[in-house]
Regions:
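Amphipathic alpha-helical protein-interaction segments
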Residues: 106-144
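Surface-exposed polar/charged interaction patches
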Residues: 38-49, 63-66, 70, 94, ...
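N-terminal "first-domain core" detector
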Residues: 8, 12-64, 68-70
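Flexible interdomain linker/hinge and immediately adjacent N-terminus
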Residues: 2-22, 131-171
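Non-catalytic DNA-binding core/recognition domains of DNA-processing enzymes
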Residues: 49-120
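Exposed alpha-helical structural elements
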Residues: 31-34, 38, 83-87, 131
């Protein structure tokens, strides 16, 4: 199997990442892979060792493809402000066998790096990338959420869930 050809970041059309139906989701998932290859290449040019650049994009991949695209149906270039907190403070915790600070920090480092490159490429507003980076850096709060999840007793899940709710289910 041949590796996907990276997208040319200068020629990306944000509208191509809109998701209105299942076919759009499949197309967007493929575009996301190609986008992440381009981000990886840009990180390498910026001085990141290839393995580190790949690991950063791996973290962004999980967030973008499994949560933003598949779960939320969002355009990753028009990401709602609350998505990082919903991912790290809820979705990751309930979808991971053993959620932990170290793994989550690696994932979020990739998300922040990816959105920094997207901002540098004028694909997202710099203020959006900065807000995403700030949410990615709030690892102490996410660790508190993990600990609170493991401490849930009786009907405490509802209160835990309501403190950081997920977006409504897609139609």
């Amino acid at each position: 199997m041949q590796a996907p050809h990276p997208l040319d970041l200068a020629r990306v059309n944000p509208d191509d990442f809109d998701i209105r139906c299942f076919d759009d989701e499949l197309r967007t998932d493929e575009l996301c892979v190609r986008l992440l290859h381009a981000v990886r290449d840009r990180l390498i040019v910026q001085g990141h060792p290839p393995q580190e650049a790949g690991e950063l994009c791996g973290g962004a991949d999980y967030f973008l493809r499994d949560f933003v695209i598949a779960e939320c149906g969002d355009n990753l270039l028009r990401l709602p402000a609350e998505r990082v907190r919903q991912f790290a403070g809820h979705w990751y915790i309930v979808r991971t066998l053993e959620p932990n600070r170290q793994e989550l920090a690696r994932l979020l480092a990739g998300v922040a790096a990816c959105y920094r490159v997207l901002a540098e490429s004028a694909l997202v507003e710099p203020s959006r990338a900065e807000a995403i980076a700030a949410d990615c850096a709030d690892i102490d709060w996410y660790e508190e959420r993990i600990e609170a999840f493991w401490a849930i007793e009786d009907d405490g899940f509802t209160a835990w869930r309501n403190a950081c709710p997920l977006p409504p289910p897609r139609p």
